[in-house]
Amino acid sequence: MHPPHTHNINSKKGMRTYLRTHGTIAEIIMWRLLKSRQIHGVKFRRQFSIDNYILDFYCPELRLCIELDGAPHFTEMGRLQDKCRTKDLLAIHNIQTLRFENDMVLKYTEWVRSKVLEAVSLCKLDGSIEDLVINPYILD
């Protein structure tokens, strides 16, 4: 007996397609950085669903998720949902999550790219991004 299929299930296809075609400017910029294996030759997928979650960007090879956060993520409820989602992805699927605010992608694109490169390198090296420090306040 096969385990239940949890990745890119058909019931989420319409929402994935909608999110791909109605993405934020930050998502468009991030996709330009990630697509075509530009980051250490690894493949990222855009709007990839796992269980009830749709991940902004996902690298199956490294089990690495990149999420871009806009205004809804800055509320108390948004922060709580993000924390639960990150915890679930790690506990259930062994997927690590790297988060950036949309504004960081817009204002500090090269810095964000360097952090993604660093995360991918860490994942390839020992499988963990636990020690990766993302501190946007050093940029101002």
Q: How does the language model describe each region?
A:
Residues 1-41, 124-140:
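Solvent-exposed, charged helical/coil patches
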Residues 19, 28-29, 46-122:
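Basic, amphipathic alpha-helical patches used to engage nucleic acids or provide basic targeting signals
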